[in-house]
């Protein structure tokens, strides 16, 4: 049987070729900007069997209703997040949608650690001096001396897959770790890390015994030199511990004036107006952000204030942008591979029901 697939962006030739090799018709919207919603609706009404989407595409009630009336069998999201997909509408019309959970774990954690070091060590002014040819001489006490990461204390807020991967990197830099996760405290993981830390100390590999433990949220904020956010976005009413504006004025003021905030989770977890004020008024030393409340970052955002240049590093939702993580056709390695595998599993009915497909999110609809 021949199926028709419409991809709203090019997720990689190798991965999409897995569909083409089956004789399936694959159409790719190969432009920098996302397709207009009217085009997505046109493709759905025209009888595509699968949509390959990204966070930029509004897949709402209108799309799912059109899909139910036509032939749409699956929406395969090339991302972990699915804020753009109306889950209730998907369930109502019995159309499964998938995501790429797990495969970008290490890439995201790695990037969080890299930008934490970048903002603390104030790397940007140094590069700017070289590029602008204002590097005239060396001086040991120039005004942008940075803060070391090694041996400091980091609070990891959210100890799911990405949080755990971040912790593994932090302990390699001899950091003490304060964990907080209201959903699930993985004591077994913490104990295993603690045993490794004890062994390192006994073998003389480190001069002191590092520590790791779960602590209350506000205690973590007060004690940490770095706070790294790895939580899902939940709004009031959706969770007992909503994370929308989790880092607001009150909580930013709890942090040390020498501490740094890192966010690679979801933009609305941080109140950006409060963060801009915290940086300008010196409540905290700096911040590194890969996600924002509105993306792309609006021209009027307070985070664009030139006075924040030395204290704030900003990136364009870039954390998972590792070559293998994004493009590998292997579903155990790459987002593209996992997206394509979800399409194959649903269209070929490999599991007997969409609800049994490993990468389908809305299993409750089936």
Residue ranges and their predicted role:
Residues 1-98, 222, 248, 254:
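An N-terminal-biased, well-structured beta-alpha scaffold segment characteristic
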Residues 9, 181-183:
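N-terminal Rossmann-fold cofactor-binding loop
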Residues 28, 177-179:
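Short beta-strand "acidic-cap" motif of Rossmann-like dinucleotide-binding folds
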Residues 59-63, 184-302:
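Rossmann-like adenosine-cofactor binding region
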Residues 93-95, 100-153, 351-360:
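Phosphate-binding beta-alpha-beta segment of Rossmann-like dinucleotide-binding domains, i.e.
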Residues 159-160:
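Glycine-rich Rossmann-fold phosphate-binding loop(s) that bind the pyrophosphate
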């Amino acid at each position: 049987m021949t199926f028709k697939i419409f991809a709203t962006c090019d997720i990689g030739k190798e991965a999409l070729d897995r569909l083409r090799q089956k004789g399936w018709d694959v159409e790719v919207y190969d432009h920098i900007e996302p397709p207009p919603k009217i085009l997505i609706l046109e493709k759905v009404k025209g009888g595509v069997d699968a949509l390959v989407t990204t966070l930029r595409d509004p897949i709402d009630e209108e799309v799912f209703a059109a899909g139910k009336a036509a032939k749409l069998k699956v929406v395969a999201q090339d991302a972990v997040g699915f804020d753009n997909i109306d889950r209730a509408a998907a369930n109502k019309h019995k159309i499964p949608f998938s995501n790429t959970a797990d495969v970008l774990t290490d890439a995201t954690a790695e990037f969080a650690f890299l930008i934490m070091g970048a903002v603390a060590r104030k790397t940007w002014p140094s590069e700017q001096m070289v590029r602008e040819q204002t590097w005239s001489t060396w001086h040991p006490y120039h005004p942008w001396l940075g803060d070391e990461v090694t041996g400091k204390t980091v609070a990891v807020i959210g100890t799911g897959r990405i949080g755990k991967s971040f912790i593994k990197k932090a302990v390699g830099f001899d950091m003490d770790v304060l964990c907080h996760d209201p959903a699930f405290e993985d004591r077994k993981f913490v104990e295993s890390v603690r045993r490794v830390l004890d062994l390192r100390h006994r073998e003389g590999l480190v001069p002191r015994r590092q520590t790791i433990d779960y602590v209350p949220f506000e205690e973590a904020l007060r004690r940490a030199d770095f706070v790294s956010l790895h939580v899902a976005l939940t709004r009031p009413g959706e969770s007992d511990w909503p994370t929308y504006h989790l880092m607001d004025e009150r909580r930013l003021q709890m942090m040390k004036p020498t501490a740094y905030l890192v966010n690679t989770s979801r933009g609305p977890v941080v109140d950006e107006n409060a963060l801009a004020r915290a940086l300008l008024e010196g409540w905290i030393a700096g911040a590194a952000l890969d996600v924002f409340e509105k993306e792309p970052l609006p021209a009027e955002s307070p985070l664009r204030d030139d006075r924040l240049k030395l204290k704030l590093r900003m990136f364009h939702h870039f954390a998972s942008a590792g070559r293998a993580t994004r493009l590998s056709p292997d579903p155990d390695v790459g987002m593209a591979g996992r997206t394509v595998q979800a399409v194959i599993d649903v269209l070929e009915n490999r599991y007997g029901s969409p609800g049994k497909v490993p990468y389908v999110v809305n299993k409750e609809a089936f």
